[in-house]
């Protein structure tokens, strides 16, 4: 088995908090120097690399003299603001030793949910890569409260992979890779060398919490691989403690767990829809509509909608869920939530008489709909 990284031309590397900090006590400059050296060699080998790095909050805690990670959102935001300065400085210094320029890019979920901002971010990152710059990306912890409380950079790594149409995502952690159970609790746990990304069995294998400094457990990495696979990118989950792990992966050595993407990828527009993390509304659809969407590749008509939940405007991305609340698809709605409530369960021929106008005969056209 050969590493999928060997054939990848555009790679997103996510480095966790434990791999760039001294047990949460500020940044580990020596470790960051080693990451810079390895990425520099990948660049020489002709690969484009985007780095997603944690560590801002841990560095901020060190600079502010805080021993324990605070629980208050505003204190976490303050630590992130202070720490981001140090994180950017260290990376700039270490990459500069190899004549490589770096760029700091701070993103929020909102940046990727808005279509225009999404395209702007994509253009910026692709331009930086064309200029030979290594973008160093982090979530903008200072302004996004829900990211600090619930988010993780594994998800961000997958989103960035899809954003730039990367070939592979490498998630480096303090674990060897994926096991069938938590090896710290179950001595019978088996290591998983390779699997198909996005299967329910993988999610069942994944454990929960991570370390006290980082926020992501193995489940977030499994879900990140599932998300990246939608754009055709393979994911490798490996230990960042392995010597020269990036160089060895690029040379073809199989290290860690490889989660392979199924054949085929979503179009860029449908990938953008699939990557929405926060949706303002959803529609409950009947079994007939579920069948038409999942098997027939049809559009969603108002007659198949049994309930409208949340408040949304025309042109927003909404979820389509079955009677049990399971999301089966999402897409761009042709009608607002208020309009959708009026035309739900009605044939398309009655839309104009009910609303006084007809935008489209479909609530969501199949070209603007993606299965999840």
Curated annotation (Swiss-Prot):
It is found in: Cytoplasm. SMART domains: PUA. SUPFAM superfamilies: Carbamate kinase-like (SSF53633), PUA domain-like (SSF88697). GO terms for molecular function: ATP binding; glutamate 5-kinase activity; RNA binding. GO terms for biological process: L-proline biosynthetic process. Its main location: cytoplasm. This is Glutamate 5-kinase. It comes from Cupriavidus necator (strain ATCC 17699 / DSM 428 / KCTC 22496 / NCIMB 10442 / H16 / Stanier 337). The gene is proB.
